[in-house]
Amino acid sequence: MSEAIFWGGVLRVAQSVSQAAPFILTGFIIAAVFRRWLGPQSVRKLFGEGTWRSLPQAWALGMLLPVCSLGVIPVMREMKRAGLRGGTILAFGLTAPLFNPLSVLYGLTLSEPFTIFAFSICSLVVVTCIGLLFDWAFPAKVEQEVHEESVPYGIKRILSVFVSMGKDFWSYSIVYILIGLSGIVFLNVILPKASFQTSVNGGDLWAPILMTGVAIPAYATPMLAMSQLGTMFQHGNSVGAAFALLILGAGLNFGIIVWMVVAYGWKKSVCWMVVLLGVVLGLGYGLEKPLYPTDIDPADHSHAFDVYCCPFSVDQSHLPAAVWQKLEDDVRPEETFGMISLFVIALTGLMFLAVERRFNLERWLTSSPEITDEKSRSMDVVLPNWVLAAAAIIGLVAVSVAMCFAYYPSPEECLEEIFIVKGEVLSAARSGHDSHAMHWIPVWEDWNRRIQVGVYLREFQLSDYQRMKARVVADYIELLEHAIEDDDQEEVKHYATLLARAHSRMVRAYQTVSKESAE
Amino acid sequence: MKMNPTGFLTRVAIIVMLSTSVGCLADNPEESGHAEHVIPEHKPADYVSAVEQLEIRTSNSLPENSEQRQQLTDIVGWLPELAAQTDLPKADWDRIQELSEKYQALAKQQDAKLLIQEIQADLDELKQLAEKTIELDAFNTYDQKELTDE
């Protein structure tokens, strides 16, 4: 038993680290840009500090910047250093991990795009309400913690960002991030494999409360949270629980809570948490009926939360090999890039810290360059720091938009991928190679979602016809999965046949669009 | 009241370690059997059966009880899904969805009489589409070929 829990914890933490790596990297970049290029005054200006716009502005910036609830920690710490008010920081910290361009696109192709619109408006209500209450109840004037010399133009200005990122890696930020990850271990210990499948069914009054308990320690990237919402709506699970999952699962973790207690003390943190939970649960129960999907057959379960439970059962063996295999299957190229980048940042951070023992790096970075050639200097336009910072932040947003097109390819490309995956699943299912089929089924489910987003991204619409064809395929994939789990060969063959037919129909539905758009 | 980060983090680490240890000692309940999709008994197997059901259920007078009314509402709601499991082209599917939405709106208004009248009025069209699905499914035999190839 303890072996399953141990290796389960190893797998869950490794999965979370790999998923979080690109977002943590982004968080360190944003924090360094805020510190070195923008500076405290411009950061306060960016967030509209002291004006009525500060909370909605924090919400809007949070929607644009691609960070998760772990990656947002360095940014929140930097915002506090810049002297922003608690309400604004917490509003940004809670919203930034909920949405990004990729996840919003994904959400808009769900059966009820209005739901995502309603959820995002409700998230604005949540952050505005608790931000206003927080700043009203605790109006203490926040002092800027440190005064920093600005970095002069030239190579030092670029280098200073890397120095900041490296040093930030070896600061309390990484401790809070590790505390955030401890929530995953905690859930792995208390939730046995697949034990949360039937806990948040639609109509269950306790579902939002139960989900709240799981969502706070859980870690979910914006994409994971959005795909879980999709699965919940597909299965007719509780809408209130889905809302709690989005706000608390994607937006909050143990690391943020601990940082908040350290930064603001127990009293303010408890008040903030109580108001947050009250508003989230209140809205969750309020949304339950109006947003409940009417065009689905409610299932009595959901697989969406299997990722929060222990991945292994007591009787499973060869767990280290299973962990390795799962990681090999799951880790995406962008996650590998994120992890390697973080490793490089960690190494350079160590190097900078070692250099600082013998040499005053900060003084060198902030000392002005000697201008030797006035003539060439006149041709060399020095851009102000805020221009570079704006370019960096807009660049991050632009990269995340470009990533949308890479992550959600054209329908033709998706269909080619699906064709390969379909062959793997159906031939493995029919020939009794269950583990092979079960490995490829989530891949097919993923491409089935991505083709819909890919069409939406390029056509700015997805017809109900295409959406329904994809839904029929998704339903049959799940029925086939259950048949394989039951080891019922007759059912496997039956659903494999139906799935193949549904796939052919879906291909025709999406090929028509491809041809029309080509013409 | 601000806290000393080091002291506070040490306390948090101890709490997390303790709670994790307690969790490890506790019995891990047996993994629950995996859940199933419950398909309602009155859900027709395909679009053709759904149209047959609509004809039967609207041939008599009003539904006798709320359960029958609910079942009728369910069936009209399933029409687009069942039609998507056929080879009907987009235009035909769109029409079925349009009719389904119209029926569901009437069902929401609790006007069973009007709902039945509307279904009866559209029944010929629904039947024609059902016949078309049979023809198309018979014509499109490539699925079977594809299965054999695999």
Model regions: which residues?
Chain A
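Short, solvent-exposed, charged loop/turn and helix-capping segments
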Residues: 447-471, 513-517
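Alpha-helical transmembrane signal-anchor/signal-peptide segments
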Residues: 294-303, 408-425
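C-terminal amphipathic alpha-helix
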Residues: 425-433, 478-519
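Selected transmembrane alpha-helices and immediately adjacent juxtamembrane segments
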Residues: 1-33, 37, 41, 45, ...
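Alpha-helical transmembrane segments of multipass membrane proteins
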Residues: 33, 102-106, 182, 186, ...
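Non-transmembrane, amphipathic alpha-helical segments
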Residues: 403-413, 429-436, 465-472, 484-491, ...
